[in-house]
Amino acid sequence: MAGFQHLSVMPEEVLRFLSPRPGGCYLDGTLGGGGHAALVAERCAPGGGTLIGMDRDLEALKAAAERLSRFGDAVRLLHGNFADIATRLDSLGVDALDGFVLDLGVSSHQLDTARRGFSFQQEGALDMRMDGDSGETAADLVNRLPEHELERIIREYGEERWAKRIASFIVRARSEAPIENTLRLVDIIKGAIPKAKWEERLHPATRTFQALRIAVNHELESLERGLKSAIDRLKPGGRGVVISFHSLEDRIVKHVFREYAAGCTCPRNLPVCVCGRQPRVRVLTGRPVTATEEELRDNPRSRSAKLRAVEKL
Protein backbone atom coordinates (compact mmCIF):
# COMPACT_ATOMS: atom_id res chain seq x y z
CA MET A 1 0.00 0.00 0.00
CA ALA A 2 2.35 2.66 -1.26
CA GLY A 3 -0.35 5.29 -0.86
CA PHE A 4 -0.23 5.02 2.92
CA GLN A 5 2.27 7.77 3.74
CA HIS A 6 2.67 9.04 7.28
CA LEU A 7 5.60 10.93 8.77
CA SER A 8 6.27 9.62 12.26
CA VAL A 9 6.27 12.39 14.84
CA MET A 10 9.34 12.97 17.03
CA PRO A 11 11.16 9.76 16.01
CA GLU A 12 14.44 10.70 17.72
CA GLU A 13 12.67 11.64 20.94
CA VAL A 14 10.69 8.38 20.94
CA LEU A 15 13.91 6.36 20.65
CA ARG A 16 15.65 8.43 23.32
CA PHE A 17 12.92 7.93 25.91
CA LEU A 18 11.93 4.38 24.96
CA SER A 19 15.58 3.25 24.74
CA PRO A 20 14.82 -0.06 22.97
CA ARG A 21 17.48 -2.75 23.36
CA PRO A 22 18.33 -5.96 21.48
CA GLY A 23 16.25 -8.94 22.56
CA GLY A 24 13.54 -6.85 24.20
CA CYS A 25 9.77 -7.11 23.75
CA TYR A 26 8.07 -3.87 22.70
CA LEU A 27 4.55 -2.83 21.79
CA ASP A 28 3.39 -0.18 19.34
CA GLY A 29 -0.28 0.07 20.28
CA THR A 30 -1.15 2.56 17.54
CA LEU A 31 0.81 1.12 14.64
CA GLY A 32 -0.32 3.42 11.82
CA GLY A 33 2.01 3.12 8.84
CA GLY A 34 4.66 1.46 11.01
CA GLY A 35 7.17 4.31 11.21
CA HIS A 36 7.84 4.19 14.95
CA ALA A 37 7.56 0.39 14.89
CA ALA A 38 10.29 0.10 12.25
CA LEU A 39 12.65 2.24 14.33
CA VAL A 40 12.01 0.12 17.41
CA ALA A 41 12.24 -3.19 15.53
CA GLU A 42 15.64 -2.23 14.11
CA ARG A 43 16.93 -2.02 17.66
CA CYS A 44 15.11 -4.88 19.38
CA ALA A 45 15.04 -7.56 16.65
CA PRO A 46 18.75 -8.44 16.98
CA GLY A 47 19.12 -10.99 19.75
CA GLY A 48 15.65 -12.44 19.30
CA GLY A 49 13.58 -9.40 20.27
CA THR A 50 9.94 -8.84 19.35
CA LEU A 51 7.91 -5.86 18.18
CA ILE A 52 4.15 -6.26 18.62
CA GLY A 53 2.16 -3.86 16.48
CA MET A 54 -1.54 -3.18 16.98
CA ASP A 55 -4.03 -1.01 15.10
CA ARG A 56 -7.79 -0.91 14.66
CA ASP A 57 -7.43 0.38 11.08
CA LEU A 58 -7.02 -2.54 8.66
CA GLU A 59 -5.62 -0.28 5.93
CA ALA A 60 -2.90 0.89 8.30
CA LEU A 61 -2.19 -2.67 9.37
CA LYS A 62 -1.75 -3.83 5.77
CA ALA A 63 0.58 -0.92 5.00
CA ALA A 64 2.61 -1.60 8.15
CA ALA A 65 2.86 -5.30 7.29
CA GLU A 66 4.58 -4.38 4.02
CA ARG A 67 6.87 -1.88 5.68
CA LEU A 68 7.87 -4.26 8.46
CA SER A 69 8.13 -7.46 6.40
CA ARG A 70 11.94 -7.24 6.38
CA PHE A 71 11.96 -8.05 10.11
CA GLY A 72 10.29 -11.43 9.56
CA ASP A 73 9.12 -13.24 12.68
CA ALA A 74 10.46 -10.48 14.94
CA VAL A 75 7.27 -8.51 14.21
CA ARG A 76 3.80 -9.69 15.23
CA LEU A 77 0.77 -7.69 14.10
CA LEU A 78 -2.67 -7.56 15.69
CA HIS A 79 -5.93 -6.02 14.47
CA GLY A 80 -7.78 -4.34 17.31
CA ASN A 81 -8.19 -1.40 19.66
CA PHE A 82 -5.31 -0.74 22.06
CA ALA A 83 -7.93 -0.50 24.81
CA ASP A 84 -7.89 -4.31 24.61
CA ILE A 85 -4.11 -4.59 24.98
CA ALA A 86 -4.34 -6.83 28.06
CA THR A 87 -6.47 -9.55 26.46
CA ARG A 88 -4.59 -9.39 23.16
CA LEU A 89 -1.22 -9.79 24.89
CA ASP A 90 -2.66 -12.70 26.86
CA SER A 91 -3.65 -14.35 23.58
CA LEU A 92 -0.01 -14.13 22.48
CA GLY A 93 1.28 -15.43 25.79
CA VAL A 94 3.10 -12.14 26.47
CA ASP A 95 3.21 -11.44 30.21
CA ALA A 96 5.54 -8.45 30.28
CA LEU A 97 6.88 -5.68 28.05
CA ASP A 98 10.19 -3.87 27.95
CA GLY A 99 8.43 -0.83 26.54
CA PHE A 100 5.49 0.57 24.61
CA VAL A 101 4.73 3.54 22.40
CA LEU A 102 1.36 5.13 21.65
CA ASP A 103 1.06 7.77 18.92
CA LEU A 104 -2.49 9.07 19.26
CA GLY A 105 -2.59 11.15 16.09
CA VAL A 106 -4.82 10.54 13.09
CA SER A 107 -2.54 9.57 10.21
CA SER A 108 -2.05 11.73 7.14
CA HIS A 109 -3.46 8.86 5.09
CA GLN A 110 -6.68 8.80 7.11
CA LEU A 111 -7.05 12.57 6.85
CA ASP A 112 -6.31 12.61 3.14
CA THR A 113 -8.59 9.71 2.17
CA ALA A 114 -11.91 11.42 1.46
CA ARG A 115 -14.05 8.30 1.82
CA ARG A 116 -12.96 7.85 5.45
CA GLY A 117 -14.80 11.05 6.39
CA PHE A 118 -12.11 12.50 8.68
CA SER A 119 -11.32 15.51 6.50
CA PHE A 120 -13.30 18.74 6.47
CA GLN A 121 -11.49 19.80 3.30
CA GLN A 122 -12.65 16.96 1.03
CA GLU A 123 -16.08 15.61 0.23
CA GLY A 124 -16.76 12.13 1.51
CA ALA A 125 -19.20 10.02 3.48
CA LEU A 126 -19.51 11.24 7.07
CA ASP A 127 -17.97 8.08 8.55
CA MET A 128 -14.93 8.71 10.84
CA ARG A 129 -14.69 5.11 12.11
CA MET A 130 -11.09 4.10 12.67
CA ASP A 131 -11.84 0.45 12.02
CA GLY A 132 -14.17 1.25 9.17
CA ASP A 133 -16.62 -1.60 9.64
CA SER A 134 -18.19 -1.53 13.09
CA GLY A 135 -20.11 0.82 15.33
CA GLU A 136 -21.93 4.05 14.59
CA THR A 137 -20.64 6.55 12.06
CA ALA A 138 -20.44 10.31 12.51
CA ALA A 139 -23.49 10.57 10.25
CA ASP A 140 -25.39 8.29 12.63
CA LEU A 141 -24.56 10.59 15.53
CA VAL A 142 -25.39 13.91 13.89
CA ASN A 143 -28.69 12.57 12.58
CA ARG A 144 -29.78 10.65 15.69
CA LEU A 145 -28.61 12.39 18.85
CA PRO A 146 -30.79 14.99 20.58
CA GLU A 147 -29.58 18.56 20.40
CA HIS A 148 -28.38 18.72 24.02
CA GLU A 149 -26.22 15.60 23.53
CA LEU A 150 -24.69 16.96 20.33
CA GLU A 151 -23.91 20.18 22.17
CA ARG A 152 -22.24 18.24 25.00
CA ILE A 153 -20.07 16.21 22.62
CA ILE A 154 -18.99 19.26 20.62
CA ARG A 155 -18.28 21.28 23.76
CA GLU A 156 -16.49 18.59 25.77
CA TYR A 157 -14.59 16.75 23.04
CA GLY A 158 -14.02 19.67 20.70
CA GLU A 159 -13.65 22.40 23.34
CA GLU A 160 -15.78 24.46 20.97
CA ARG A 161 -17.31 27.62 22.44
CA TRP A 162 -19.90 27.75 19.65
CA ALA A 163 -21.17 24.26 20.51
CA LYS A 164 -24.72 25.36 21.32
CA ARG A 165 -25.20 27.18 18.02
CA ILE A 166 -23.56 24.42 16.01
CA ALA A 167 -25.80 21.76 17.58
CA SER A 168 -28.86 23.91 16.93
CA PHE A 169 -27.90 24.44 13.29
CA ILE A 170 -27.25 20.70 12.83
CA VAL A 171 -30.69 19.78 14.20
CA ARG A 172 -32.36 22.38 11.99
CA ALA A 173 -30.49 21.17 8.89
CA ARG A 174 -31.18 17.47 9.47
CA SER A 175 -34.92 18.18 9.72
CA GLU A 176 -34.74 19.20 6.06
CA ALA A 177 -32.57 16.28 4.91
CA PRO A 178 -30.18 13.80 6.56
CA ILE A 179 -26.59 15.03 6.91
CA GLU A 180 -24.55 12.38 5.13
CA ASN A 181 -21.36 13.97 3.77
CA THR A 182 -18.50 15.97 5.16
CA LEU A 183 -18.83 19.16 3.16
CA ARG A 184 -22.51 19.60 4.00
CA LEU A 185 -21.62 19.41 7.68
CA VAL A 186 -18.79 21.89 7.10
CA ASP A 187 -21.25 24.35 5.54
CA ILE A 188 -23.60 23.95 8.51
CA ILE A 189 -20.78 24.66 10.96
CA LYS A 190 -19.62 27.68 8.97
CA GLY A 191 -23.16 29.02 9.07
CA ALA A 192 -23.35 28.55 12.84
CA ILE A 193 -20.14 30.42 13.68
CA PRO A 194 -20.25 34.14 12.83
CA LYS A 195 -17.64 34.76 10.14
CA ALA A 196 -16.13 37.62 12.12
CA LYS A 197 -15.33 35.08 14.86
CA TRP A 198 -13.50 32.59 12.65
CA GLU A 199 -9.95 32.01 13.88
CA GLU A 200 -7.17 32.99 11.50
CA ARG A 201 -5.18 29.73 11.63
CA LEU A 202 -7.95 27.26 12.46
CA HIS A 203 -10.64 26.00 10.11
CA PRO A 204 -14.10 26.63 11.62
CA ALA A 205 -14.95 22.90 11.43
CA THR A 206 -11.76 21.65 13.13
CA ARG A 207 -13.11 21.34 16.66
CA THR A 208 -16.47 19.85 15.70
CA PHE A 209 -14.84 17.22 13.48
CA GLN A 210 -12.42 16.37 16.29
CA ALA A 211 -15.32 16.00 18.72
CA LEU A 212 -17.27 13.69 16.42
CA ARG A 213 -14.19 11.57 15.69
CA ILE A 214 -13.52 11.16 19.41
CA ALA A 215 -17.15 10.24 20.08
CA VAL A 216 -17.40 7.78 17.17
CA ASN A 217 -14.24 5.93 18.20
CA HIS A 218 -14.58 6.26 21.99
CA GLU A 219 -11.03 7.57 21.92
CA LEU A 220 -10.71 8.97 25.44
CA GLU A 221 -12.11 5.87 27.13
CA SER A 222 -9.85 3.69 24.98
CA LEU A 223 -6.82 5.81 25.84
CA GLU A 224 -7.24 5.59 29.60
CA ARG A 225 -7.99 1.87 29.60
CA GLY A 226 -5.23 0.97 27.16
CA LEU A 227 -2.63 3.19 28.80
CA LYS A 228 -3.21 1.65 32.23
CA SER A 229 -3.08 -1.87 30.78
CA ALA A 230 0.19 -1.12 29.00
CA ILE A 231 1.81 0.34 32.13
CA ASP A 232 0.68 -2.67 34.15
CA ARG A 233 2.51 -4.96 31.67
CA LEU A 234 5.83 -3.12 31.85
CA LYS A 235 8.77 -4.90 33.45
CA PRO A 236 10.75 -2.99 36.10
CA GLY A 237 12.87 -0.55 34.11
CA GLY A 238 10.51 -0.79 31.14
CA ARG A 239 9.39 2.47 29.57
CA GLY A 240 6.21 3.87 28.08
CA VAL A 241 6.08 6.76 25.59
CA VAL A 242 2.86 8.51 24.59
CA ILE A 243 2.40 11.23 21.96
CA SER A 244 -0.86 13.17 22.20
CA PHE A 245 -2.25 15.83 19.90
CA HIS A 246 -4.84 17.77 21.86
CA SER A 247 -5.38 18.86 25.45
CA LEU A 248 -8.00 16.22 26.27
CA GLU A 249 -5.60 13.40 25.42
CA ASP A 250 -2.66 15.07 27.15
CA ARG A 251 -4.74 15.62 30.28
CA ILE A 252 -5.57 11.92 30.50
CA VAL A 253 -1.95 10.88 29.93
CA LYS A 254 -0.71 13.32 32.57
CA HIS A 255 -3.37 12.18 35.06
CA VAL A 256 -2.63 8.46 34.57
CA PHE A 257 1.13 9.01 34.86
CA ARG A 258 0.64 11.01 38.07
CA GLU A 259 -1.68 8.36 39.47
CA TYR A 260 0.91 5.63 38.89
CA ALA A 261 3.75 7.82 40.20
CA ALA A 262 1.94 8.70 43.44
CA GLY A 263 3.09 7.21 46.72
CA CYS A 264 1.36 7.27 50.08
CA THR A 265 -2.11 8.85 50.04
CA CYS A 266 -2.68 8.82 53.80
CA PRO A 267 -3.76 12.05 55.53
CA ARG A 268 -0.76 14.10 56.64
CA ASN A 269 -1.79 13.95 60.30
CA LEU A 270 -1.28 10.17 60.46
CA PRO A 271 2.08 9.33 62.10
CA VAL A 272 2.67 6.27 59.88
CA CYS A 273 1.47 5.12 56.48
CA VAL A 274 -1.45 2.73 56.60
CA CYS A 275 -2.39 2.71 52.89
CA GLY A 276 0.77 0.90 51.80
CA ARG A 277 0.71 2.60 48.42
CA GLN A 278 4.04 2.78 46.62
CA PRO A 279 4.93 4.64 43.41
CA ARG A 280 4.77 2.31 40.42
CA VAL A 281 6.45 4.52 37.82
CA ARG A 282 8.89 7.38 37.54
CA VAL A 283 7.81 10.19 35.24
CA LEU A 284 10.65 10.99 32.82
CA THR A 285 9.14 14.17 31.38
CA GLY A 286 8.42 16.94 33.87
CA ARG A 287 6.91 18.91 31.03
CA PRO A 288 5.74 17.44 27.74
CA VAL A 289 8.36 17.31 25.00
CA THR A 290 7.43 19.08 21.76
CA ALA A 291 8.75 18.93 18.20
CA THR A 292 11.89 20.83 17.23
CA GLU A 293 11.79 23.79 14.85
CA GLU A 294 13.40 21.61 12.19
CA GLU A 295 10.69 18.97 12.49
CA LEU A 296 7.97 21.61 12.41
CA ARG A 297 9.31 22.77 9.06
CA ASP A 298 9.41 19.23 7.67
CA ASN A 299 6.16 18.01 9.23
CA PRO A 300 3.69 20.79 10.14
CA ARG A 301 1.29 18.24 11.63
CA SER A 302 3.75 17.76 14.51
CA ARG A 303 2.92 21.27 15.73
CA SER A 304 0.42 20.14 18.37
CA ALA A 305 2.24 16.94 19.40
CA LYS A 306 3.21 16.45 23.06
CA LEU A 307 5.36 13.55 24.25
CA ARG A 308 5.30 12.18 27.79
CA ALA A 309 7.22 9.18 29.12
CA VAL A 310 7.44 7.00 32.23
CA GLU A 311 9.68 4.23 33.57
CA LYS A 312 8.34 1.31 35.60
CA LEU A 313 9.82 0.99 39.09
Curated annotation (Swiss-Prot):
Binding-site positions, S-adenosyl-L-methionine: G34, G35, H36, D55, F82, D103, Q110
GO cellular component: cytoplasm
Gene Ontology MF, one: rRNA (cytosine-N4-)-methyltransferase activity
Broad EC category: transferase
SUPFAM superfamilies found in the cross-reference section: Putative methyltransferase TM0872, insert domain, S-adenosyl-L-methionine-dependent methyltransferases
GO biological process per UniProt: rRNA base methylation
Pfam families referenced in this protein's UniProt entry, alphabetically: Methyltransf_5
EC number in record: 2.1.1.199
Keywords per UniProt: Cytoplasm, Methyltransferase, rRNA processing, S-adenosyl-L-methionine, Transferase
Location relative to the cell: Cytoplasm
Catalyzed reactions: cytidine(1402) in 16S rRNA + S-adenosyl-L-methionine = N(4)-methylcytidine(1402) in 16S rRNA + S-adenosyl-L-homocysteine + H(+)
Its biological purpose: Specifically methylates the N4 position of cytidine in position 1402 (C1402) of 16S rRNA.
Sequence similarity: Belongs to the methyltransferase superfamily. RsmH family.
NCBIfam families, per the entry: 16S rRNA (cytosine(1402)-N(4))-methyltransferase RsmH
Record-given protein name: Ribosomal RNA small subunit methyltransferase H
